[in-house]
From Swiss-Prot:
FMN binds at residues 62-66, 86, 142, 175, 216, 244, 267, 296, 317-318. Pfam families: DHO_dh (PF01180). Its cofactor is FMN. Pathway: Pyrimidine metabolism; UMP biosynthesis via de novo pathway; orotate from (S)-dihydroorotate (quinone route): step 1/1. PANTHER family: DIHYDROOROTATE DEHYDROGENASE (QUINONE), MITOCHONDRIAL (PTHR48109:SF4), DIHYDROOROTATE DEHYDROGENASE (QUINONE), MITOCHONDRIAL-RELATED (PTHR48109). Catalyzes the conversion of dihydroorotate to orotate with quinone as electron acceptor. Its EC number is 1.3.5.2. GO terms for cellular component: cytoplasm; plasma membrane. One of its GO terms (biological process) is 'de novo' pyrimidine nucleobase biosynthetic process. This is Dihydroorotate dehydrogenase (quinone). It is a peripheral membrane protein.
Length: 364
C-alpha cells in the first residue's frame, strides 16, 4: 500500500528525472539483497524457450535499462529476464527534451527518447565487469542503428553491435520498429528486412552458434505487412518475434492534452492492439518460432491474455512504472491463479490456448 502514495509524489517530478533516480537506486542494490528480496519462483510458471530456462514468463522490456546494467536490482524485482537496450554502436544523446510524458489517467507513457545510450563500448565494459552471479536469469540485448546512419548502411551498425555485445547476451534482439528514429521502420519492409536479418543471423551464427537472435516488430503494420514480416523473419533464421514496440496510434487517448506529442504510446491503451498482433504472429508462425508479447502488460490478466494468444514470454516496462516494485510478484501470483482456474498444470499448457478448441476453460 506504500507504493500508491510514493508514486503520487514521484509523479510530481519530471519523468526522466524519476527514471534516473530509479536507476541510481537499483544500481545500489547488493546482490545478496537482490537474491533475498526476489520473489520465490512459482514452479508452474517456469518455461523453456530458445534453449534458455526462464523461471517465469515476465521479463523487463527494452527501454528501461539502456546500458546502465543494473542487473541485480532489476532481477531482485522478480523479472525472469532482463532485456538491455536499445544499444547503438556509437553514443548518442537521443531526441531533445522533454521527450517522456505520463498519461496517468490512461496508465500510459508517451516517449520520443530516440535510442539515447552511451554506445556499445560502454555497455560491453559494464557487462564484462559484472560477476556471473549477478545474472539471476537470461539477459537479452536489444540493438539498433545510430540516428545518423542511413538505412542503406544500417546493417553495419547492427553487425557491429552483435560483434561487440554477443559474448554478454543470452539472446539478441534486432530493433527495427521504434517510431522515434526517422526512417527506422522502413527496415521492416520485405527486401530490407530480409537482407538485414540474413546478415545478422549469419554474423551471429559464425561467432556464437545457437545463440538466439530475435526481431522486434511494430504494432502499426497492416495485417498483410505483419504476415510478410513474420514469414521473412523466420525464413531468414530469426529465433523469435518480439511483438510489439510502442504505437503511433492515439486510440483511447485522443482527448488527452499530450496526445498531439510526437512519439510512441505504451501502457494500457496499447494492450488490446499488442495482444491482437501477438495472436496474428503466433498463427502465422505456426509453432516455428516463439512469440514474446510486449505492450500494455499492466497486470496478470493482461499477461495471461497475451499468453493465451500465443506468447511464450511477456515483457513489461510501463506496467512497472505504474505498478511499482511489487508489480512482477503480483503478476506472477495472478498468473498462477488464472492457470489453476482454467485447469492448466503449467504455463506452457496455456500458450496459444485461444487458438485451440477445448484449450482450457474460457478465459475471463
Amino acid at each position: 500500500m506504500l507504493w500508491p502514495a510514493l508514486r503520487s509524489v514521484l509523479f510530481q517530478l519530471d519523468p526522466e528525472r524519476v527514471h534516473h533516480l530509479a536507476h541510481w537506486a537499483l544500481h545500489r542494490v547488493p546482490l545478496a539483497v537482490a537474491r533475498a528480496r526476489r520473489p520465490a519462483p512459482i514452479p508452474a510458471l517456469a518455461v523453456r524457450c530458445m534453449g534458455l530456462d526462464f523461471d517465469g514468463p515476465v521479463g523487463l522490456a527494452a527501454g528501461f535499462d539502456k546500458g546502465d546494467v543494473a542487473l541485480p536490482g532489476l532481477f531482485g524485482l522478480g523479472f525472469s529476464h532482463v532485456e538491455i537496450g536499445t544499444i547503438t554502436p556509437r553514443p548518442q544523446p537521443g531526441n531533445d527534451r522533454p521527450r517522456l510524458f505520463r498519461l496517468p489517467e490512461h496508465r500510459a507513457l508517451l516517449n520520443r527518447m530516440g535510442f539515447n545510450n552511451e554506445g556499445m563500448e560502454a555497455c560491453a565494459r559494464r557487462l564484462a565487469a559484472l560477476p556471473p552471479a549477478a545474472r539471476l536469469g537470461p539477459v537479452g540485448i536489444n540493438v539498433g542503428k545510430n540516428k545518423v546512419t542511413p538505412n542503406e548502411d544500417a546493417a553495419a551498425d547492427y553487425l557491429a553491435c552483435i560483434e561487440r555485445l554477443h559474448p554478454y547476451a543470452d539472446y539478441l534482439v534486432v530493433n527495427i520498429s521504434s517510431p522515434n528514429t526517422p526512417g527506422l521502420r522502413q527496415l521492416q519492409e520485405r527486401d530490407a528486412l530480409d537482407r538485414l536479418l540474413r546478415a545478422c543471423v549469419r554474423h551471429l551464427a559464425e561467432r556464437a552458434p545457437g545463440k538466439p537472435l530475435l526481431v522486434k516488430l511494430a504494432p502499426d503494420l497492416s495485417p498483410e505487412a505483419l504476415d510478410e514480416a513474420v514469414d521473412v523473419a523466420i525464413a531468414a533464421g530469426a529465433a523469435g518475434i518480439v511483438a510489439t514496440n510502442t504505437t503511433l496510434s492515439r486510440a483511447g487517448v485522443e482527448r488527452h492534452p499530450r496526445a498531439a506529442e510526437a512519439g510512441g504510446l505504451s501502457g494500457a491503451p496499447l494492450e488490446r492492439l499488442a495482444t491482437d498482433v501477438v495472436r496474428r504472429c503466433y498463427a502465422r508462425a505456426a509453432g516455428r518460432v516463439p512469440i514474446v508479447g510486449v505492450g500494455g502488460v499492466m497486470d496478470a490478466e493482461g499477461a495471461y491474455a497475451k499468453i493465451r494468444a500465443g506468447a511464450t514470454l511477456v515483457q513489461a516496462y510501463t506496467g512497472l512504472i505504474y505498478g511499482g516494485p511489487g508489480f512482477v510478484g503480483r503478476v506472477n501470483a495472478g498468473l498462477a491463479r488464472l492457470l489453476e482456474r482454467d485447469e492448466f498444470s503449467t504455463l506452457s499448457d496455456a500458450i496459444g490456448a485461444d487458438h485451440r478448441q477445448g484449450g482450457g476453460k474460457a478465459a475471463g
